Amino acid sequence: MAAELSEDGETFEIIDLFGGQADLQNKVIRCVGDPHTRLTEDALRVLRGVRFAVKLGFDIHPATRAALKDCGHGLKRISRERISVEFQKILCSPAPLRGVSLLTDLGLMPHVLPCGTSPYGTGDLHHLPNDFAVRCACLMWQMPECDLLENIRGLKLPGVVSHAIVTLAK
């Protein structure tokens, strides 16, 4: 979308070449142009698509959803710190359980948490305080310690946050 100012400089007209306004009204996340191309240009967009969907309560367009699934392997080229930041935002969103479900359904969870999540605490995410360490610990509750520690190392978190997650998850 772009805005074109009128000659008087007071008003403007929105020029929507890609249907962005309709997508906003319909609450749909969609890539501009070919989704595979957009997600290959910057693989972090894969996680951002999930984050925006859960933060805004939007659906993901089927073609974009398919591309998110197909392009997840590109996350191997993204720094663990950047992946961790997106994961923190997903878990601290208004719909953390939906975020975890999307990450799992799209095959993205192994790129975020290499050892996966615990089968025990996932359903309780929406009842927990909006605190990353608490929600992350819930995802890893009662995991084998070696898996828990590998997940934590992979997230590249500050020591105090890592320690809190490990303590809570045991």
Question: What are the functions of these language-model segments?
Answer:
Residues 1-64, 70:
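Acidic, glycine- and histidine-enriched catalytic cores of nucleic acid- and nucleotide-handling enzymes
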Residues 76-170:
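Conserved, hydrophobic alpha-helical core segments of structured domains
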Residues 30, 38, 45-51, 65, ...:
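Arginine residue identity/basic-tract feature
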